[in-house]
């Protein structure tokens, strides 16, 4: 979907509208309001951070004075001012992700596409990137694709669940959690029972509590002896119910 919106993939049918107008007919006018952070890190190894961002701002047609101001502010907000003269190849994975987030925000785009922005990062860097996205999302449409549910649980207004290229459901976090309130239960079991449970149900977390194995089951027809956990639902439960396996 992101490749279609960014016109990196040609459409065979359908339409994509921005303010009621087809984006292909808008051409450059739409590209000027679009920022894109692809999943694969793309940069020039020997360029410094500052030079890389200025180079991309020129490609975007951003006036030099505006680019200078935006780069300075964004480097400060992402805590990268101290490394702005270092080569891209010398940065950590998290720093590179922050630089790529900056380039997506150059020109003050109204639509920002972020494809797996925290992939491969440690928990600390993932939280940092997530918080930056939350801060920069004010006044923008941010479309974030991720398999890490914690990335979106606290910052998204709407969550789109897609499977095999088709939209399965679109709702807020609260509405999605409510939709599986009676679809998630926990069942104490012996470890030897897990293979059988996995063959019959969608099994989420398996935990040990007070010396006992507890399996989290997701689905429509769950064992009556299992315990409802409607007060402790997560987006992982939503993911398992709607997207894992056949439904």
Describe each region flagged by the PLM:
Residues 6:
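Helix-to-loop junction immediately C-terminal to a conserved catalytic motif
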Residues 14-25, 29-30:
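Conserved ABC transporter NBD signature motif
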Residues 54, 58, 65-83:
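Conserved ABC ATPase "signature" region
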Residues 87-91:
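Conserved ABC ATPase signature
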Residues 101:
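Hydrophobic anchor residue at the start of the ABC signature
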Residues 112-116:
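Catalytic Walker B motif of ABC-type/P-loop ATPase nucleotide-binding domains
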Residues 128-216:
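ABC transporter nucleotide-binding domain
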């Amino acid at each position: 979907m992101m490749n279609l919106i960014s016109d990196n993939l040609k459409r065979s049918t359908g339409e994509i509208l921005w303010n009621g107008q087809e984006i292909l007919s808008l051409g450059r006018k739409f590209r000027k309001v679009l920022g894109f952070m692809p999943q694969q890190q793309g940069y020039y190894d020997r360029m410094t951070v500052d030079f890389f961002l200025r180079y991309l701002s020129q490609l975007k047609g951003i006036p030099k004075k505006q680019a200078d101001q935006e780069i300075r502010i964004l480097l400060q907000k992402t805590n990268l001012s101290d490394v702005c003269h270092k080569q891209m190849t010398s940065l950590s994975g998290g720093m590179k992700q922050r630089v790529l987030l900056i380039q997506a925000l150059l020109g003050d785009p109204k639509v920002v596409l972020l494809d797996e922005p925290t992939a491969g990062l440690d928990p600390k860097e993932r939280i940092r990137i997530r918080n930056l996205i939350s801060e920069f999302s004010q006044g923008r449409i941010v479309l974030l694709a991720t398999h890490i549910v914690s990335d979106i649980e606290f910052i998204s207004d709407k969550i789109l669940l897609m499977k095999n290229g088709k939209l399965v459901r679109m709702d807020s976090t609260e509405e999605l959690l409510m939709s599986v309130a009676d679809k998630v239960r926990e069942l104490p079991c012996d470890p030897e029972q897990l293979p059988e449970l996995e063959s019959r149900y969608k099994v989420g977390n398996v935990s040990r509590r007070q010396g006992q194995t507890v399996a989290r089951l997701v689905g429509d027809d769950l064992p009556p002896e299992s315990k409802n956990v409607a007060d402790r639902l997560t987006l992982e439960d939503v993911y398992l119910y709607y997207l894992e396996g056949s439904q």
